[in-house]
Amino acid sequence: GLLASLGKVLGGYLAEKLKPK
């Protein structure tokens, strides 16, 4: 569903932000 898709996108975004560079 739409919410599931948004959750995946948001989760990926947070993972990238929290990932140490």
Swiss-Prot record:
Record-level GO cellular component terms: extracellular region
Expression by tissue: Expressed by the skin dorsal glands.
Glycoprotein among keywords: no
Major subcellular site: secreted
Location(s) in or outside the cell: Secreted
Cystine connections: none
Molecular function GO labels: nitric-oxide synthase regulator activity
Alphabetical keyword list: Amphibian defense peptide, Secreted
Alphabetical GO biological process terms: defense response; negative regulation of nitric-oxide synthase activity
Function: Has no antimicrobial activity. Strongly inhibits the formation of NO by neuronal nitric oxide synthase at micromolar concentrations.
Protein name per Swiss-Prot or TrEMBL: Dahlein-5.5
Natural source organism: Ranoidea dahlii
Lineage: Eukaryota, Metazoa, Chordata, Craniata, Vertebrata
